[in-house]
Amino acid sequence: MATAAQPSLELALELMSKVPLIGNISQSTHKIPIQCTGLTREQDGHNDWMHMIRAYYDFQVDDRFQPTKDLAGHVDLKRLVQGRAGAVFWSVYVECPKGENDFSDAVHHASMRDTFQQIDLLQRIMELYSDRMEMAHKADDVMRIFRSGKCASLMGAEGLHQLGNSSSVLRIFHRLGVRYVTLAHAKNNLYVDSATSEAPIHHGLSPQGRDMVREMNRIGMIVDLSHVSEKAMVDALDVSLAPVIFSHSSAYALVPHVRNVPDHVLDRLKQNRGIIMISFIPWLTNKDPEKATVENVVDHVLHVGNRIGFDHLGLGSDFDGMPSHVQGLEDVSKYPNVVAAMLQRGISTENVEKIMGMNVIRVLREVEDVAASQKGLLPVLEDAVPQLWDDGIRAYVKKLYPHAEHDRTGASETTTVDKAIEKDV
């Protein structure tokens, strides 16, 4: 039996749910009740199941995905239920274009198309498992879905390369339900340097990157700083009006890997009211990845919590986005193990509740609030579209409709269209 001094896995499960662990969902029809005033179920800030389906199952959602079936990898519906997943940010990640530092539109078109395919894939999964999972678009949706007993599902895109260099596409992603965008993945892009690129090219955020962060603030898209260079982390924290996240990173002080977050950036994160979601990636968790354990994950939680407070923490597994796993966190069914480990290490139930999901819900709500407060104040970031009509056609239109609006507000110089009209006259 568990004691107050040494909470066990059984106590963690009791805190997460009042029903027995469901081992075979075909034998049970009940949903897991939520205690919204006590510990909620686990919230995962980054899960790559959609990439596993694309890469291993060739994008095919068929009879293999029936709720009672076992799937390859770290995730399937049975294990999500066993692990009491309460909310998940599903990554709609696609790979960066081949080569380094080619930021032309043409090389990014395939990434943009593939991202729309991944969004469609997740929506098909939602339809298949509609009695267990539901898409969430706002913080209030997450809480409502929590209370219904389903898994609240949100989307995150993993790199601005997925936009095809278009702010219009960013806004379309947001309308489709994407709620965070990681600024970079493995390579530099037009907007930002990656932590793992061959060499920096912007030395942080480019001017376009600063504009993109402001546009994300304006529309209510969370800025995710996992994968970006250290200088880019600082630049984004300088620019962002809203809290930012690290969706799947850990503490550099414990494991000095470029994907982890240095203490001075953590200090800035506290000022920003953002969160770092501690990853389950072995090489970010322990200097010897083969020895990485759930206890090491909690080491990172404690380091961050003791330095900047437990209000700035979450969990971001990267399940199905890595070839191995941390001991004790083999797949999504093992989420309760990290809860038990946090309790055993003396983290209060109140703080565990925050880490398990309440912090990210707060950030989501504050990002929504910033977008509402900036409505009409921040200008829309418009794409630079090449001129389609030549000056002759444009002069004809301007002459045909002399009393219509023509020139942009504030334009002072005589345009080539005006000159064409004058010549025609």
UniProtKB/Swiss-Prot annotation:
Its cofactor is Zn(2+). Its EC number is 3.4.13.19. Keywords: Dipeptidase, Hydrolase, Metal-binding, Metalloprotease, Protease, Zinc. Dipeptidase; part of the gene cluster that mediates the biosynthesis of an unusual class of epipolythiodioxopiperazines (ETPs) lacking the reactive thiol group important for toxicity. Firstly, L-tyrosine is prenylated by tcpD, before undergoing condensation with L-glycine in a reaction catalyzed by the NRPS tcpP leading to the diketopiperazine (DKP) backbone. Afterwards the alpha-carbon of tyrosine is oxidized by the cytochrome P450 tcpC to form a hydroxyl group. Induction: Expression is positively regulated by the thioclapurine cluster-specific transcription factor tcpZ. InterPro entries: Metal_Hydrolase (IPR032466), Pept_M19 (IPR008257). Substrate binds at H185, R259, D318. The keyword Repeat does not apply. The gene is tcpJ. It is an enzyme of class 3 (hydrolase). The keyword Ribonucleoprotein does not apply. One of its GO terms (molecular function) is metal ion binding. It catalyses: an L-aminoacyl-L-amino acid + H2O = 2 an L-alpha-amino acid. This is Dipeptidase tcpJ. Disulfide bonds: none annotated. It holds the Pfam family Peptidase_M19. Belongs to the metallo-dependent hydrolases superfamily. Peptidase M19 family. Zn(2+) binds at H46, D48, E158. Gene3D superfamilies: Metal-dependent hydrolases (3.20.20.140).
